[in-house]
Amino acid sequence: FQAEDGIRDRSPSRGLGDVYKRQLEKTAYKDKVAIFVTCYGNRNEPDVIEDLIAILKHNKIETKLVKQEKCCGMPKMELGDLESVESLKNFNIPQLMELVEDNYNIIAPIPSCVLMFKKELPLLFPDDESVQKVKNAFYDPFEFLMSLKKDGNLNTKFIKSLGEVAYHAPCHQRVQNIGPKTKDILELIPNTNITLIERCSGHNGTYAVKSEYHEISMKICKPVISKIETSNVDHYISDCPMAGHQIDNGVQNIEVRSESPFTLLREAYGI
């Protein structure tokens, strides 16, 4: 399927549509980014992709979606189906290589998908030169934003504080060894305090959605839930939306529910 279908089948939106395209044409770009939308971003929460696009546009980043993509292959790899992993790799990598050769950086909104292209595929296919080139061009979204800050190109004019925010750093992001880049970016917002939670949510890919394991997965999530419930937070977030919803299933004593860090950053920008 085409990555655009899931979000463009919707009515014209803040991030996409003719107005958005015209605005981009007038922008003096500082860099180029292609978004690997992912299965989840395309079909489950396209609003999150729109928030990410709005943030990039606000920072004068030329932005496009990967024209065609299939699943990154992480779910198949976790099931040991390496034949399907290779088949998906053989479809996705040529699409991404076209962007790499056109000097695009590539990001994805789901940590598992970022990990697949940055770590897992390069380990599985060490002799595939294209896989290695895609790896070198692939970034976590907040890792990319932090690179803008280091170069003095990140827009830090925020108009809204976020208050107290509990931030769950998902496992598939932590093993990328990039540091808490989401926390680092959000802490640039005035009057915003980020409490970092580095514990497994228990979701673990498809583990938590299987009836025989769901109860165990919620027990794994209990320390995260307890920390959030006792922290008097205005918001709680996770880079992994599945982890966020897993936490939602357990919290009882507070009214707030999980949000995307892209959504909060967009709110802070007032865009």
Question: What are the language-model segments listed below?
Answer:
Residues 2-9:
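Short, exposed "boundary/linker" segments that immediately precede the start
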